[in-house]
Amino acid sequence: MNSVVLQLSVVCLGVSSQQITDSQRLFSIAVNRVTHLYLLAQRLFSDFESSLQTEEQRQLNKIFLQDFCNSDYIISPIDKHETQRSSVLKLLSISYGLVESWEFPSRSLSGGSSLRNQISPRLSELKTGILLLIRANQDEAENYPDTDTLQHAPYGNYYQSLGGNESLRQTYELLACFKKDMHKVETYLTVAKCRLSPEANCTL
């Protein structure tokens, strides 16, 4: 009887280890993808800023600090401490919402260069990967909204009348918000991935 129990325990441990390994692999792919998007966003934003006059940069930065990104309507951890306390499923769901919120506005960032044309397809790949991770972690005992029910406010602030520098401001804000959101997703996925290694130090 004891040998049967031992064999079953070994089998269960093997299945559990395999699930963790699969999740780690999916997390590694997702983190690599969002890191690429974040670096891409940094480069595009830097290139755009370099094309502006000093006064234009100052004015646009001042306006942006007073404005909001679409992601500000998505409830997410307010600081690194809350991020570390959040569950894996919660971090994945928020990341999914952030990525999904860029499906439409990312079209405004496409075109004009090979770098910009990478954005939409890479966002789609990242969204698919995060959805797979959410499904793999759905057995977690937490009542968190399904990804299909996540609601996002319209990207209205980018399509309002912005005055004479409308095009400049819209591009500046889109690139700045895209960079900000990809950094958020990178942070959340990195912390969630770290949780799979109990001995790891997940301090931000």
Swiss-Prot record:
Residues 1-17 form the signal peptide. One of its GO terms (molecular function) is growth hormone activity. Zn(2+) binds at residues 36, 186. Pfam families: Hormone_1. Keywords: Disulfide bond, Hormone, Metal-binding, Pyrrolidone carboxylic acid, Secreted, Signal, Zinc. The modification Pyrrolidone carboxylic acid is found at residue 18. The keyword Signal applies. Coiled coil: none annotated. Disulfide bonds join 69-177, 194-202. GO terms for biological process: animal organ development; growth hormone receptor signaling pathway; positive regulation of growth; positive regulation of receptor signaling pathway via JAK-STAT; response to nutrient levels. Its main location: secreted. The keyword Protein transport does not apply. It is found in: Secreted. Belongs to the somatotropin/prolactin family. This is Somatotropin. It comes from Oreochromis mossambicus. The gene is gh.
